[in-house]
């Protein structure tokens, strides 16, 4: 059996849309950690969920297996593996992913954390800028938005409500 191109397989996995935020891909979110070839010839894709309790984890794994199997033409078994260390952080969202979120009315997490220990607290995005008008004069409406990883905010300048990805 020919050796598969792991970079092309990784690109196929990274192109899978996130089931909860379909405007971004798993690659945009930095969820696809590695693609390897197992001893038995199966392709294994390592995935790091955005947080341990993410309800989309199984759907993401199934979508990746389906996409990679289709990419390979069904010639190999495909497995996914959940990797929890290092823990996912919003720093892993690409600049392109942040742009896509903003363009679709979702405030991306702000800033990037400094190197060192990771805080064990979820920020509610007090500094979230409105994705419509850019104002930083926003208020928290609810700590929980349309998905568990978002909060609901409203802009004081333009009055629009919007989802904001919680900084982690």
Indicate residue ranges for each PLM-predicted region:
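Short, histidine-centered active-site or binding-site loop motifs used for metal coordination
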Residues: 47-51, 84
């Amino acid at each position: 059996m020919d050796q598969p191109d792991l970079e092309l397989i990784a690109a196929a996995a990274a192109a899978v849309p996130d089931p909860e935020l379909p405007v971004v891909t798993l690659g945009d979110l930095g969820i696809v950690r590695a693609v390897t070839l197992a001893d038995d010839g199966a392709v294994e894709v390592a995935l790091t969920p955005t947080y341990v309790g993410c309800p989309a984890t199984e759907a993401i794994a199934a979508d990746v297996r389906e996409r990679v199997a289709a990419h390979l033409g069904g010639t190999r078994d495909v497995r996914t593996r959940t990797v929890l260390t290092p823990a996912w952080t919003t720093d892993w969202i690409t600049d392109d992913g942040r742009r896509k979120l903003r363009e679709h009315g979702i405030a991306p997490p702000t800033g990037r954390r400094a190197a060192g220990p990771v805080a064990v607290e979820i920020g509610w995005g007090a500094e979230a800028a409105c994705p419509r008008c850019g104002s930083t004069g926003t208020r928290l409406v609810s700590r929980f938005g349309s998905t568990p990883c978002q909060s609901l905010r409203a802009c004081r300048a333009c009055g629009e409500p919007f989802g904001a990805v919680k900084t982690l």
